[in-house]
Amino acid sequence: MQYTKISHMNPAERVEALTASLVSLSSVNGTVGEGTKADFIKEVITSYPYFQENPSHVWEQAIPNDPYKRKNIFAFIKGHGESRNTVIYHAHLDTVGIEDFGPLKDIAFDCEKLAEYFSRYEFDQDVQRDAKSGEWMFGRGSVDMQSGIAVHLANLLHFSENLETLPGNVLFMANPDEESQHSGILASISELNRLKKEKQLHYLAAINTDFITPLYDGDQTRYIYTGAAGKLLPCFYIYGREVHVGDTLAGIDPNFISSEITSRLHNNIHLAEKVEGELVLPPSCLYQRDNKESYNVQTAVSTSLYFNCFIYERTAKEMMDLLIEVTEEACRETEQKLSDYYEEYVKRANLPKKHLSWGIQVYSLEQYLEKLRNRGIDPEQCIEQTFKANEHLELRMRCFQAIEELQKLDPDQGAKVILFYAPPYLPHNYLKEDSARDQLLQHVIKEAADKTAESTGETFVFKKFFPYLADGSFLSLHETDGEIDSFIRNFPGWNMIGTIPFKDIRKLNIPSINMGVYGKDGHKWTERVYKPYTFHVLPLLIQQTTVHLLQSYRMTITAKEPKGEG
């Protein structure tokens, strides 16, 4: 879409037109469409008069070794004066797939046809009502988050045409692969550091427009999130004692152990962090299966299990300690049950007892590797060889395979559970009460929100953590070097598959703010964005915030960068 097509429009019309155009182009994660979408975004920006005059202010960055040739798109606007203060706008350009649209796949990216379809859709009154109102735009990516890109593109145009109102700089970036491995934002870290060094930029904050949604029925609040929740993927390799089903009472079934662990962890709200006023989620099971590939009458040898764990204020080490404790409880109860079942069995069958051990050992990966080293085994070599020999496996299965190979080398073939971390890992970050920079940022954003609320009638509420996964997690780091080292020691093959540049992120230390587009049903076929707020109010809120930030900050106020030990 060229500048000439939107130059005559008012600001809200520009955002709507850009959103519809962006939605119409498929950019499903893990497809070449992500590269096509990046090219389109670059084409839009380069058509703006400012960038026609400053073509070097728009550029792309290829994602290293990417099979889909994806890229980041950057655009830089230098405001009036010589300020180095800079606000970052960022958004992800990929979407989830369209399989959920079923027979409507052909119109998954057609906003008008979907609105027409849902206006006749009688199976969900809320969806039908929204479609009939004309205030909602439907389509894959409409809310997550093509409209978010459109808001940034419209604000780029606004500031490029009103440089006198911009007392600093704006740096825009559109990133691919947020819905999977976050390779876009991770690649951008080096570029952000390059710009920081070469242009002597002082990054004040990064504003993400990832979608916000009602937290309960009738919720009209617009939430502003001043930090990002993190994510861990704790994995459990469970090794049992295989037996024929005719001797089942003598075995230790890894599925039994797995079930005991899952029953204690899955959706257990009592294990969730307690952060006042925040939407905090408990662990949830994402994968649970044994190693059997076909039918036979043997019990399983091993089971693989992993969970999604959001982290808010906890560290990876604290989470590992908690999971070890829960797993040990599960194993002790399993041992007792198996022993009781066997005792009752031999009593009923009037059989002599065998001398069986019901012990189940529990290790963190760090503990298990140390045990193997003490027995003269080189675990690092085994892990490296396994990763190289299994590059066809997806990352999590490669990790499980490495643990299985380690178990084969272990002279102790008793039942055991080995806990480790696998990708993806997203750091958490938030504004700290003891940081002058963070408190100033909180104050400035609140001023901008209050001003916008006064002129629009909207109600804004601040939250500490964006409750879902977002690229903003990778822009600053709260963990100390010691805590990061503890995480890496429990992550098999980090030196081969670990992609997070911790030191470079620490150099940036950019606060992440989410001022999102507003909508419903993200990742569902009924996904839709609310036009009155997203197209009319949100661009103004971000403009106000940008100007307030650039006016309020001075170079004498510097970020308290973590030193790595604490």
UniProtKB/Swiss-Prot annotation:
Keyword tags: Arginine metabolism
Pfam family, one: Peptidase_M20
Gene3D superfamilies found in the cross-reference section: Zn peptidases
Induction pattern: By arginine.
Single GO molecular function: hydrolase activity
CDD domains associated with the record: M20_ArgE_RocB
InterPro entries listed in its UniProt record: Peptidase_M20 (IPR002933), Peptidase_M20A (IPR050072), Uncharacterised_RocB (IPR012166)
Gene Ontology BP annotations: arginine metabolic process
Coiled coil residues, start to end: none
Superkingdom classification of source: Bacteria
Function per UniProt: Involved in arginine degradative pathway.
Annotated protein name in UniProt: Protein RocB
Protein species of origin: Bacillus subtilis (strain 168)
Gene it is expressed from: rocB
